[in-house]
Amino acid sequence: MEQDSDLESGRATNQRPPRVRVRGAGVRGRGRVRRRALSEGQRRSPFRLDDLQLPDSLYVTRALQRDHALEMPRGQVDFSLIEAEERRAGPTDEWYFESVKTYRAKPGDDLQTLIKNYAKISLECGAVYEINSKIVVTGACYIIGNCAVLRANLPVGTAMFEVLNVDVIPSIGFMERIVFSNILFDCRSTTAVVCCISERNTLFHNCVFSGPHMLCLDIRAGAEVRGCHFVGAVCALRSKGLYSVRVRNSIFEKCAFGVVSGSKASISHSMFKDCACCIMFGGQGTIAHSHFMATTCTDTPMNLQLCTCEGNGSHVVPLGNIHFASNREAPWPTFNANVLVRVRLYMGRRRGVFHPKQSTFSMCVIAAPRGVVQRIYLFSVYDATCAILQLGEAGDAATERLCTRGMRHNTPSLRAAYVTDTRIDREINSQDTAEFFSSDEDNL
């Protein structure tokens, strides 16, 4: 009993005193809403912008300021200062294309000196620049053409630009290679010159090569050609060496030679019209999503008789509109989704099987020597009006023809025989299958 009385006394002492709620002035009742000192539009922020000490108008929290240092953009500087700074402190990643000051060249200026001193050159829109001497480029070069015209007044065979691998190109973002953009290379009918001889990786973007150029681009160290237009040139592009060349979204029109490549080449989304030899591949390559068309066989340059030589002229064969030279070490070029109209495709001796998947051969001829015809696979190919010819020598009859290397050779005449047993038996294989389906059609 004494223990129970002690517990009751302990509970009485630990309990809180009862609350006494009195309704009166300044006391909120259950049914009243507390009045706000400020309205919704006048509500104060939990912090002030002045407390953050922001460097600009962006809302940057203090945590980000501790982890990241905001660097304000600097103005453009001369190329010579960037070059001198790199020589002193070494390559850095703080300079980009927009950091280099642009020099606006005028007609009559010495372009070779301007390129060496400023590297980033802008030409006047629509102006005509007379090139009276060869321009040698030894270092960085980025020319913004603005549709300016470069007209050559040079002897036959002289190059307008010669790019040499002499000086070191500074570490500037998006200026790592030589760039020619939006330039119209004009060649008068009296002088056949070379537009550019490059021994460095070069980019030609949206340029036009008009006139009877002896050779538009002589690529010796790799290049990328995109969005360019070649009209009436003797040879549009020639590539040799161990470096690859890439051609995209370009047009070749009325050229004696389009692309002559002895190295690895890639051609995509381009058009070749009325070229005596659209493509001549001596090595590996890829041709995809391109259009080859011949509209006449009597006008220049389609009436030219051309040839190509192998083994320093020991083996000479007539040149086709699309020509794959013999190379026992290289496989056939990848040939996908192309359209050929009135074109002659010549195939030399190579490894593997040639499969022009998803390609259209309209009124075309595929010519190949003995033993190569059996390696042509026409599955999933539109070949209703395509003929396959097997070539053989006709005897001692020969004609002199112009070679891809600029020389002339006596080319033997060839005898052709039709081959008809390379097609699939359509009485057994249906066309209502996935044979002509491509996964790329899902993206269209």
Swiss-Prot record:
Matching Pfam families: Adeno_E1B_55K
The entry's cellular-component GO terms read:
host cell cytoplasm; host cell nucleus
**InterPro entries registered for this protein in UniProt:** Adeno_E1B_55kDa, Pectin_lyase_fold/virulence
Keywords, A to Z, come to: Early protein, Host cytoplasm, Host nucleus, Host-virus interaction, Modulation of host cell apoptosis by virus, Phosphoprotein
- Which family does the entry's similarity section mention? Belongs to the adenoviridae E1B 55 kDa protein family.
Could you give the domain comment from the record? Contains a PML interaction motif that allows the subnuclear PML localization.
Protein name, per record: E1B 55 kDa protein
Question: Which species is the source of this protein?
Answer: Canine adenovirus serotype 1 (strain CLL)
